[in-house]
């Protein structure tokens, strides 16, 4: 059995996309991890899966798996690629679709130039909603001081359908993203782990951002991370409310807009890379594992 797939990216955040509306495949953590291997598999940051909806008021079910095989609630760059993919595969002819995710409903709107606007929903900031459960909370206004391997780190928390910690830095180029990101991502205060964003405010409508993603590591771009960072910046008064904020990541820029009490709106590009097929049993056998069928 051969399964068709498409390789896509949103600002360098790369995805393997599989249509399970017209195809059938049993996805296991072992298979996903093998497919994610950039030397022996396809290679990707996340696997995006298109499935039939489980409720009548949406068009599709949108599932996301990290390269370590774990299923996650949300991926903003992936959502844009998802919208373009279902159009290209003629699974939908709508320019505006609703999809269900583990964290709720997303509305995706495409244009004719490869850009997609995503209604990311309202950000949540309460610790229980992240979830964020430090043994002792040291808080100054909206900032928390967290002990990270013996060093106090000031951070902000936000949930954009998935958990985020945001750290304001003077220069993202000198920020120790690998060491600090890894330590915070798996910190006991974040029971479901966390994505860690390092934000440099350039002016009221421009930030630079690096994100250490949960279960992946640092990526070229992170859509939900950009939304969490901009929402945090607006909440703290560093950025302009209700205006388009340019979030500049290594892979390119996203436009984020938010006013408190409303949804965060994210707009950005997508790109198709190539299409191919793979044999699930062949992938498993190559690794010395029992075939799926």
UniProtKB/Swiss-Prot annotation:
Specify the domain of life of the species encoding this protein. Answer: Bacteria
Site note Important for dimerization applies to: 274
One Gene Ontology term from the biological process aspect of the record: lysine biosynthetic process via diaminopimelate
Q: Which residues cross the membrane?
A: none
Reactions the enzyme catalyzes: (2S,6S)-2,6-diaminopimelate = meso-2,6-diaminopimelate
Tell me its EC number(s), please.
5.1.1.7
GO CC, one annotated term: cytosol
Chief location bin:
cytoplasm
Binding residue positions for substrate:
13, 46, 66, 76-77, 162, 195, 213-214, 223-224
- For the keyword Amino-acid biosynthesis, the answer is yes
This protein's pathway reads: Amino-acid biosynthesis; L-lysine biosynthesis via DAP pathway; DL-2,6-diaminopimelate from LL-2,6-diaminopimelate: step 1/1
The answer to keyword Amino-acid biosynthesis applying to this record is: yes
Record text on subunit structure and interactions: Homodimer.
Family per similarity comment = Belongs to the diaminopimelate epimerase family.
- The protein in question is named Diaminopimelate epimerase
Origin species, per record, is: Psychrobacter sp. (strain PRwf-1)
Q: Which gene encodes it?
A: dapF
